[in-house]
Structures are given as structure tokens and as C-alpha cells.
Amino acid sequence: MAKRVHLFDWHKEHAKKIEEFAGWEMPIWYSSIKEEHLAVRNAVGVFDVSHMGEILFKGKDALKFLQYTTTNDISKPPAISGTYTLVLNERGAIKDETLVFNMGNNEYLMICDADAFEKLYAWFTYLKKTIEQFTKLDLEIELKTYDIAMFAVQGPKARDLAMDLFGIDINEMWWFQGRWVELDGIKMLLSRSGYTGENGFEVYIEDLNPYHPDEEKRGKPEKALHVWERILEEGQKYGIKPAGLGARDTLRLEAGYTLYGNDTKELQLLSTDIDEVTPLQANLEFAIYWDKDFIGKDALLKQKEKGLGRKLVHFKMLEKSVPREGYKVYANGELIGEVTSGTLSPLLNIGIGIAFVKEEYAKPGVEIEIDIRGTRKKAITVTPPFYDPKKYGLFREE
């Protein structure tokens, strides 16, 4: 049976399409993908992303454990702030892209992908048990996914909405900075973060879930529902729209963000014999802190010496067509890779995508062809984002 988020009943009543995604029944759209997408680019939208995973690490050894099991340096940010970091396997391949918040008092909250949290929880539990064969750890690992409702408010008007709701200016916060806030007596974690390319914030509310796998923890999500409805109520004057996963995907792709399960994963069994994707191949080296030891480091150092072989690259179509995952990519008549993500940009009305190709073609300005249902259509590799960053996105000129 598919998993359900806290507010599934609300979405079932209001969404036009609900579909299973990563094992969860989720709203895909309420009005239309294009309308919700443009609302976020031009005003503000709110997403229920409670399907995202949360894992809590507690204890004096929590930091040391996470420093070894993730790639970035999570010791630097003060409480309450987050660090974008990767979890790798021993071969250096990406198990997931995560955000780890330093919650203070030796507690760290990891935000991970919907289709990866169970795997990660099992992985961390296994590593803890393995290490404890040699030395005792002061560490507890707790799965919190079903206990936390998570909403993402995104768009140029998100700043105004945060001021109205919480009395804070998110532009005075750095990216991934968090703080505790209250709304009508309901306490929650707020972070300046998002997955759309736009300014925005995300809130985390601990609440009962009527669909919790543990029957004893089931109940009405009164706090989460109240916050969700207050966001929609206060956002009306800014043109807010509830947005589904359809718009979330087109928005992240326009911004050039990778999606775990498509662009990054441990096993990617495509017809071009792509097995696994590493941070170096996915242009994610910025999330690696080389001055420490971590799982997968040796494999990455060897890959640096040997060469990447293949790499992710962004592209836009030069002919009218829409690229999709799995479509073959050619250059000079040679098969060079496959599309990992593709869509029609609602903002630009052109086909855009990400492909995993031979390393020598993974640079801007290379003419390629995408095989779309037996016809090769012209495209060109580009540097993301796909939109004009002076007009749209986090760094737009107001």
C-alpha cells in the first residue's frame, strides 16, 4: 500500500490529479502544472513535501558519525543551520543528496529524498552496528519521516508572506539557515531553502499523521492543517497557488537541479551501461570537503586520476520537441549517452533536459541530437539555469 502524507485527505479533496510517486500518493497538480509553475516563478506557491524523509541523529558521537558518512563539513554551521551534503557508497556513487541541520545539543536532522529515506535509515543503522563491534557509540538514530509535515513556500513573494506570517525577513537569513518560529501558538522549524531556483522557505511541523504506519501514533494533523490553511489564506493577496509535484519537477529542472532517482543514483541501469553516478560526474564536487575522511573518498580520488568517463550536462532543444528520460543522445553520429531528466519548460516553452554523456561532450555549447521516438532532434548543451537569472530566480534583479 502506498504511503500517505499528513494532509492526504485535503489533497484528495482539492487536487485534480493524485498519483503514486516514490511509494507515496501525492498531489501532482491542483489546477495545471503550467499555472502552478508560473505562480511560483512570478508570485508564490506552496508545496506539501511531507513525503521527504527525515532522520534524527542524537548523541555525543552524532557529529563524528555524520562527518564520516557524508561528504561535506557539517561541523561549521552553527545551530540552527543546514549543510547540503551527499551520502555515498564505498564506490563513491551517490546514495542520496541530503540537507543536514545542526539542531544544537548534539542533535542533527537529515532531510533526504522520498525514495531514499528507508534505504538510508537501514544504511546508517548498519554502519552504527558495524562500528559498535569495535567501539561503543553515544548515538541514537531515529526515523522521523512520518512524524513531520514539511511545506515549501517558494517564489518572489515568499519573502513578503514570511514577514506576514512570522514577522521575519528571510532575506536576512543565509541559504539553509534555520530558526524556530511560531504561528498561532504552533512551533515549527523554518529554513530559508527550496528546490525551485526561487527565493523561499520551508517549514517543518511535528504532528500526528492519520496514515502513520504505527497505529498508536495516528491522529488528526490539526497543527499541520492549520499552518497549511493559514499559508494559503495569508498568501491570497500575493496570488498564492497550492502546487503539486508536477510543477516542482519542471521548476527544479528549469533551475538545473538534479533529481535523485533520475540524474543521481547508485544503480542506473540504462541501455548505455551506466551503472552508477558519482558527485564528480554530477557536478556536485562543491558538496565535498576533501580535508576529512568519508565513505567513498578513496573511490573518488581514484576516479579523479583515471577520468570520469561520463558526466551530467544540461541541454535545450533547438527544434520543437520534448526530451524524456531514457531518450538516447548522439553527437557526430555517435551514441554518447542518455537523457536522465527532460520536460517542456512552462516558462520558456522549449524542451530542456539533463543527460549523462561521454565526458568530452559535457561542456556548454556542444551541438547534440536527441532521439525522440525515432527522429533525431537538434539540441545544444548549456550552463544552467535555463531562464535569465536577472529576470527569474533567487538572484533576480528587483
From Swiss-Prot:
GO terms for cellular component: glycine cleavage complex. It catalyses: N(6)-[(R)-S(8)-aminomethyldihydrolipoyl]-L-lysyl-[protein] + (6S)-5,6,7,8-tetrahydrofolate = N(6)-[(R)-dihydrolipoyl]-L-lysyl-[protein] + (6R)-5,10-methylene-5,6,7,8-tetrahydrofolate + NH4(+). Keywords: Aminotransferase, Transferase. One of its GO terms (biological process) is glycine decarboxylation via glycine cleavage system. The keyword Repressor does not apply. InterPro entries: GCS_T, GCS_T_bac, GCST_C, GCV_T_N, GcvT/YgfZ/DmdA, GcvT/YgfZ_C, TrmE/GcvT_dom1. Its EC number is 2.1.2.10. It comes from the Archaea. GO terms for molecular function: aminomethyltransferase activity; transaminase activity. Pfam families: GCV_T, GCV_T_C. The glycine cleavage system is composed of four proteins: P, T, L and H. The glycine cleavage system catalyzes the degradation of glycine. This is Probable aminomethyltransferase. It comes from Pyrococcus furiosus (strain ATCC 43587 / DSM 3638 / JCM 8422 / Vc1).
